[in-house]
Amino acid sequence: MSQKARPTFYRQELNKTIWEVPERYQNLSPVGSGAYGSVMSAFDGKAGLRVAVKKLSRPFQSIIHAKRTYRELRLLKHMKHENVIGLLDVFSPATSLEGFNDVYLVTHLMGADLNNIVKCQKLTDDHVQFLIYQILRALKYIHSADIIHRDLKPSNLAVNEDCELKILDFGLARLTDDEMTGYVATRWYRAPEIMLNWMHYNMTVDIWSVGCIMAELLTGRTLFPGTDHINQLQQIMRLTGTPPASLISRMPSHEARNYISSLPHMPKRNFADVFIGANPLAVDLLEKMLVLDTDKRITASQALAHPYFAQYHDPDDEPEADPYDQSFESRDLEIEEWKSKIYIQNRN
């Protein structure tokens, strides 16, 4: 791998933080900040477009931080798909490993997220088809690389004025219990098996989330706005019914088996009665996504071939990803070792 030529950097203080960026990035202005860093929009003079520049907060604060930084960099570098956020540039002002403390990532600047769009307007069935088709097209690609998003929700789906969609923040989420507690959107879109640790989950946790998102686009309301884990599960089972004995017996968790078995029996509702007025094909697809048994839940590839997407589905234009080496996930390295790996990724 060849090394990038080092650009000229300039310094600027924004929101009480020093930003040190290459001269090609001008007119920095704050977009937002989260637990893992803050984001500025900037004009990329070289490419002639506005971009998002993310400065990771304390990327090497702990082994967990350093590994997360490495994971994010590797994932973004691997993703090359129209419906998935990819990496345009990565840089650090450091000239040596010793001085390497900051990591900046540059991605496409996306305008609204799906949350903004649902709040502002009632979507037509055609809009819903196109948006959900793009999410599934992205998931087919991500899942083919053995990557699970784990945290799909409307705020992680960026949409531009042409209704073109990109998935953000994927594969990073190894969410802790406290982030899932209470009346939080993070949990409303979560598959029950991941929320309650029922069993080893698979790629279809993301399909459950798509079902929740699709239902919300069709109705304008959150499908399962649970106030806590238990209430969330009750809301889910009012629609899906309680799990059959055959599914309960496959749950490795003794606690989960006992708890689910103790619940009063609830029958599955007729989805057509719940989603009144929706396209029958949309209802049929929802019924195949919102299935408690992960082995029976539809996959992204299967969903793309569903008749609901007849006007968009093109098997020759729904690509898969190159294999993605995740062997680093099982490695226990020291902070300095992760830092060195990130430095090499940053230089190339």
Curated annotation (Swiss-Prot):
Disulfide bonds listed in the record: none
Outcome (variant: residue 181 to A): Loss of enzyme activation
Protein name: Mitogen-activated protein kinase 14B
Resulting phenotype, residue 183 to F: Loss of enzyme activation
Uppermost EC category: transferase
Gene name for this UniProt entry: mapk14b
Record keyword Transcription regulation present: yes
Domain of life of the organism encoding this protein: Eukaryota
Needed cofactors: Mg(2+)
Keywords associated with the record: ATP-binding, Cytoplasm, Kinase, Nucleotide-binding, Nucleus, Phosphoprotein, Serine/threonine-protein kinase, Stress response, Transcription, Transcription regulation, Transferase
Mod. after translation: Dually phosphorylated on Thr-181 and Tyr-183, which activates the enzyme.
Annotated positions binding ATP: 31-39, 54
Gene3D superfamilies in the record: Phosphorylase Kinase, domain 1, Transferase(Phosphotransferase) domain 1
Modified residues (Phosphotyrosine): 183
Ranges where the Protein kinase domain occurs: 25-309
Motif (TXY): 181-183
Pfam family for this entry, one: Pkinase
GO cellular component assignments: cytoplasm; nucleus
The record's note on its domains: The TXY motif contains the threonine and tyrosine residues whose phosphorylation activates the MAP kinases.
Active site: 169 (proton acceptor)
Compartmental location: Cytoplasm; Nucleus
